[in-house]
Amino acid sequence: MRLAAIASALAILLCAAVFGAIFLQRTSVSGPAPSPALAAPGEEQASAIGASARVDAARTAPGTTEQPMVVAQAAPAAAPTTCSNPNGLGVARTVEIDTTGGPGFGFEHFKSHDFLREGEIVLTFDDGPWPKNTPNVLAALAAHCTKAIFFPIGLHATYEPGLLKQVAAGGHAVGSHTWCHQDLSKTKGKCLIGGKTQAYEYDPKDEIEKGISAVRWAVGGPTAPFFRFPALRQPQELIDYLGKRNIAIFSTDLDSFDFKMRKPEQVRQSVMAKLKKHGKGIVLLHDFQHATGEGAMDLLNDLKAAGYKVVFMKPKFPVTTIASYDEAIMKQVKGPVSDGRPTSSVVRTISE
């Protein structure tokens, strides 16, 4: 029994020795797979960038025919818009407008683009920026977390550039409404300049372009290729001109006629009655008008209570200005003396 047990043990040891020798031989030829090393903080990213650079360098080396590799990167996610007002109108839908060819909007003049659904409205404000009235409109829009299109007058923009910057900073679209709010079917009129009404002769195209350049200067950044004719008087040759400039033309579906009203409740009643009749539409208001500024909050409250939804129209690309008009505006707003220095380097608050 003992001899048999000893023999079995020796056999097991012999087999183990044989298999161990085979294993050692194999590992000495191929070697074990290396364990992945943990990168120190920052090393992993640097390595990935380096590898990408080497691949790109190899692909774009002189004499190679292979095209460079383009790596698509996801755009940063937009920060969600929060509204502290649970009863705010908000923005139900945002639409992007390709202004190529100068499309027209507003069924009072244009019938091509019926994109609004029942109960949807677009808020638009003309003739600003103007002290007190425009800030009241902006405050109401902000309280309701909603957006609008503004069509400022170029001359007003040069008076209140800081105010127009606030409009743009609020996320609203900023179009234009000529330089001095003239009837573009004519070439003579009157313009309120420096607090005085003066006889005024003009070229209609100059009126359009000076207004665009003035608004762009006042905002200090991109503005929308959106235009509205004063008094909605739209000569065909200027419609064609704006089409070549790729600027969309805005008429209206619902004119509030707030410029005829002195009381905020009249403006509200006008808008709500017309919406009840039409059910949807582009609404024309004026942030220049006191009654509209004073009643803006109540009007938005009424729109919310009635279940209307705001659609925000934003441009696919910004408007382009014409250099000669930009230069003319700069001469007008800066005067004959300008050293080119920013105001912050000339005027500094040292006590307050």
Place the predicted regions along the sequence by residue.
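Hydrophobic alpha-helical membrane-insertion segments, chiefly the h-region
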Residues: 12-24
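Juxtamembrane proline-rich low-complexity "stalk" or linker regions positioned immediately after a signal peptide
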Residues: 27-73
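Alpha-helical scaffold elements lining the catalytic groove of polysaccharide deacetylases
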Residues: 133, 182-219, 233-279, 292-294, ...
